[in-house]
C-alpha cells in the first residue's frame, strides 16, 4: 500500500493551511457524523482516509460546503415537517 503524503494532498487543495482545514472537516464527517468514505478504508484512520480522498480529488472545500448545505436543508425540512405534524395534531 502506498503511503499518503501531505504533499500529494496539498497539490490538490493549493496550500497547506486550507488542506489541513479540509482534511479535518472530512475526517470529522467520517469519524463523528458517520459519513461513508469515498475510498477503500483499508483499516486507515479517518484522517488518512480524508487525505487519500483529497489526493484523489474527491473532496475539497467546495464539496464539503455543498454537503453541509444539503445536510442543513434536510434537517430543516425534517424540523418543519415535525412542527407541521404537531400543529395539525398528528404524531410522527
Swiss-Prot record:
Which reactions is this enzyme annotated as catalysing?
A: RNA(n) + a ribonucleoside 5'-triphosphate = RNA(n+1) + diphosphate
Keyword Transferase recorded: yes
InterPro entries xrefs = DNA-dir_RNA_pol_omega, Pol_omega/Rpo6/RPB6, RPB6/omega-like_sf
Which Pfam families does the entry link to? RNA_pol_Rpb6
- GO CC annotations on file: DNA-directed RNA polymerase complex
Q: Could you tell me one molecular function GO term of this UniProt entry?
A: DNA-directed RNA polymerase activity
Instruction: Please name the SMART domains in this protein's record.
Output: RNA_pol_Rpb6 (SM01409)
Statement: the UniProt record of this protein carries the keyword Nucleotidyltransferase: yes
Alphabetical GO biological process terms: DNA-templated transcription
Question: Which enzyme type, at the first EC level?
Answer: transferase
EC assignment: the record states 2.7.7.6
| Domain of life of the native organism | Bacteria
Q: Which Cys-Cys disulfides exist here?
A: none
Keywords in alphabetical order, please.
DNA-directed RNA polymerase, Nucleotidyltransferase, Transcription, Transferase
- Please name the NCBIfam families in this protein's record: rpoZ
Q: How does it assemble?
A: The RNAP catalytic core consists of 2 alpha, 1 beta, 1 beta' and 1 omega subunit. When a sigma factor is associated with the core the holoenzyme is formed, which can initiate transcription.
Function recorded in the entry: Promotes RNA polymerase assembly. Latches the N- and C-terminal regions of the beta' subunit thereby facilitating its interaction with the beta and alpha subunits.
**What family is this?**
Belongs to the RNA polymerase subunit omega family.
Protein's name according to its UniProt entry: DNA-directed RNA polymerase subunit omega
The top of its lineage is:
Bacteria, Pseudomonadati, Pseudomonadota, Gammaproteobacteria, Alteromonadales
